[in-house]
Structures are given as C-alpha cells and as structure tokens.
Amino acid sequence: MKKPFVSIVVASYNRKYIINESIQSILSQNYPEDSFEVIVVDNNSNDGTVSEIKKIFSREIDNKKIKLLDLKLNSGSSGSYIEALKVIREDWKYMLKMDEDVVLDKDCVAELVNEAEKSEKHTFVGGKVFYFQNKDTLHAIGADLKPYYAIAKGIGVNETNHEKFSEARTLDALNGCMVLISRKIEKEIGWFDKDYFLYYDDHDLMYRSIKAKNIHRFTPKAIGYHDTKTGSKNKYANKQWLYYSTRGSLLFLKKNFKSFSVGWFLYLLAHNLKFTAGLFFLFFHSNYHNFLINLRYFFKGYLHGIQGKKGFYDINQNGLNVVVFSGGRGSINLCDGLREFSKVNDVNLNLTNIINAYDDGLSTGAIRAFFDYKILGPSDLRKVQETQYEFYY
C-alpha cells in the first residue's frame, strides 16, 4: 500500500556548517522516495548557506526532489512554514517541520507517520530529540502547556535515563525542532501565525489544536539529534531569545485569552519571577555590563508585547543609540566627543548620559532608557576614549 505523502520543510538561517548533514539525513530515510519531498526555506542567510546547498545538492534541486526557496527577507520560523505552503505538493498529508540543525535517524519519518496513522485525531507527532554533541542526553521530548500564564514546562530536558520515555504517550506539546503535522490542522484551525516571528508559534498552533479536541503523540521510535552549539549555554544571555520569547508570551496571552483575566495575573507573577531568576543567574555568571544589556532586551520584549508589536523586529537597529552610565567630568567630555563623532561621520546618534548611575544604583530614568538605547559601561567608555571615538555597540 502506498505510504502517505510527507513534505519535509527545513527552515534555514545561517547554518552552513550543518545544513548539508541535515538534508542528507532526510534523503537517507527508510521511507519510499516517491512519498516525500524536501522544501528548504532559507531566510536570507549571509554565511553562504544557499550556495552550499546548491553546490552539494544540485542534482536533487534540478529533479525537484529538493525545492529551495531563497527568500530575500527573513520571514522567521513561522513565516518559513507559511512560505512552504506556496510550493508544497498538492497531495501532501503530513508536513515534517524541522530546524536546519537537526539530523534525523534513518527510520524517523517512517515512525512518525506510523504513529500519526493510528488515528485521524493524531494531528501532531514528535519523537526523542537528543543533543547532537552528546547523543546520550535528551534535548527534550515535549512539554506540558500552562496556557493561562504562557509557560511550557519541558519534559525530558537534559535527561539521561531514557527508560522513562520508552513508551508512546500523549503530550500537550512536542519538541518543535522536529514534529510531524497533519494537513487536517490547516483545514480545521489554520496554520502558523507569522505575528510571532520566532518562539511561541509552535505553542500557539498546538494550543489551538488541543482546543479543537485533537491528540498530540510522542513516539520513542522516532529519533533526531539537535545541534545546539550555536546557542548560548545560558539562554538568558541570548538577546534574541530574551526579546522574542518575552514578546511572544504576551502576544500568546492577548490572542488566546481576550479579557484581562486571572491568566494575565498569573503570567505577571510567575513568568516575571522565572525571567528575573534567569537574568540574575546571568548577572552572577557574567558581568554587570552584559547583565544590563540583556535586561534591556527583556524589558523591550515585555513592552512590545503589551503594545502588540508583531512580526520581525530588528534588535540591532541602525544608528547609534547610547546610554552612558557614568559620573563626573569624564563622561561629559565623552558625550561631547560622541556628538562630534556623529556629526563628522553623518551618524544618527541618540545619546543619554545618566550621571552617577554606578554610585547611586539604577534610576527610573535608566530603566526607561533600556527600551530605546544601547548601553555603554565603564570598560566600553575606556575603549572609546583610547581609540578616539571608535564606537563599540
């Protein structure tokens, strides 16, 4: 009997170092060759990812086994799977959504499909995802959703006792880096919401699926390996994660819970405690300067979430937006020098000098400044002075 057709969609951005291994693991699946296709959606990579794919897989691209979408703008995670629908084969039954830094075991697709085919209600199916660098340790198998305060509690995170996850089970959410999605979802509740751009797009779609009385299944027989070496060892040191996950959690609440209910109160209480704890962990394991920078991205994500800002946001915006935390005459001279530098070099400069910030603690003005300005600490001030206004940001 002919197997259901699976479209395997890989969202790609600056992963030249591993994208070939990821694609090769797809092409090597123990699944009928005429029953799956590969769609790679590249989000305007600048590290040569697209050129590498074209060089290594030119034959597969020519014969349409691989469809390569070379986007000129970054559409984000959610946007990648929306773009894929424009070129997907008409008879697809399942989409395997996967990150570009995931490598599949040879039986992964077959095992995911086997579990999905057991019931029409099995709209999401995931498997065991291990770390690529440490194949004895689980990355995660999924999560329990806590929708009223926008938190997903991971299951199997960093677990080495695999026997606990040797049986198939029903979960709220599956590991989003490798999950099979039934076409029934698109017809029944719609697709990914591009408003999120990064993070919470999976949670949103799975939550809507649960509300539609569908079932999400984990099968231990489907195995993948996630390369996380480009990520921070501490996610609270990742400004992109801090901004988009904070903003996404608020967008999730505003979208799925229309009134300002108990859910919002629980979110403000529990979620902020979680982020505050993480940021202070960074403070004690990093330095004061980095702590302030990352705190800024958390507050900006929080503010933009409340404001309802959606889609892509350039967290490295053009122009020089500076807060100088310092005191005394030296900081005043430095600010004057920076203003002169901006005029000579035709640079848009937004400058705030907060006097005595390090002596008196962070003022209300300093906290407000996190929303709109980059930060220079004492070490950076010295660098600027030593290089005669070469700017670090």
Positions of predicted regions on the chain:
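Glycine-rich, basic loop-to-helix element that forms the pyrophosphate-binding segment
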Residues: D70-I88
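Glycine-rich nucleotide/cofactor/substrate-binding loop typically near the N-terminus or early
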Residues: L351-Y393
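Non-catalytic, C-terminal membrane-associated alpha-helical segments of glycosyltransferases
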Residues: Q240-Y244, S259-Q317
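A short, conserved alpha-helix in the catalytic core of glycosyltransferases
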Residues: D172-I181, I185-W191, D195-I223
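Conserved donor NDP-sugar-binding/catalytic core segment of glycosyltransferases
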Residues: D107-A140, D144-P147
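A conserved acidic beta->alpha catalytic loop
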Residues: S25, D42-S51, L73
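Short, acidic, metal-binding catalytic loop of nucleotide-sugar glycosyltransferases
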Residues: S25-S35
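Short beta-strand-to-loop acidic/aromatic patch adjacent to the donor-nucleotide binding site
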Residues: W92-V103
